[in-house]
């Protein structure tokens, strides 16, 4: 982390995703099914830039330099840990990252916003197509030496919240069965 502090204006790597225990438990408790994860893409636009800019520094995804791949990897991890992942499953989850932004410019609070369209298909038929979003806030600082590393640390929590909102949707879980 100390290296990040002195490297303002440089490029840093986002932390690798770490599965949420609550998300994994929700998937475990959601019934008998298996799923595979298809491709996730990103829709470029304002609020969805790659890399993410943090006060003159840029943060890249550790997964093929793609935040869509970050979300894809997150779902793979959580389905795998819940013993719901199967490469030959009929249900396939895919999606499009629509918004992905961190703001570390606040005096005392940092924020993150993420939005993605999630699609579940079985044998080519779309059973689920919904947009989910999440907002995350954390204590920050006016000092970039504090704010930038903290924003980087908080990114996986933002993705965990996005997936929690997806798994809380009974229609998503029903489409997997």
Task: Give the residues covered by each predicted segment.
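Sec-exported extracytoplasmic/periplasmic mature domains
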Residues: 76, 80-84, 102, 163-171
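A structural "domain/chain start" motif
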Residues: 10-69, 73, 171-177
């Amino acid at each position: 982390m100390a290296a990040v502090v002195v490297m303002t204006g440089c490029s840093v790597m986002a932390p690798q995703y770490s599965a949420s225990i609550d998300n994994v438990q929700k998937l475990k408790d959601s019934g008998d099914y298996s799923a595979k994860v298809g491709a996730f893409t990103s829709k470029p636009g304002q609020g969805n830039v790659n890399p993410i800019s943090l006060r003159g520094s840029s943060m890249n995804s550790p997964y093929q330099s793609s935040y869509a791949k970050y979300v894809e990897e997150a779902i793979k991890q959580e389905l795998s840990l819940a013993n719901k992942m199967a490469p030959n499953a009929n249900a396939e989850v895919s999606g499009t990252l629509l918004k992905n932004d961190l703001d570390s410019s606040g005096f005392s609070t940092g924020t993150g916003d993420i939005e993605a369209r999630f699609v579940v298909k079985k044998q080519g038929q779309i059973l689920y197509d919904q947009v989910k979003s999440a907002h995350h806030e954390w204590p920050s600082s006016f000092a970039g030496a504090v704010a930038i590393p903290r924003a980087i640390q908080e990114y996986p929590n933002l993705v965990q919240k996005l997936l929690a909102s997806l798994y809380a949707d009974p229609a998503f879980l029903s489409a997997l069965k």
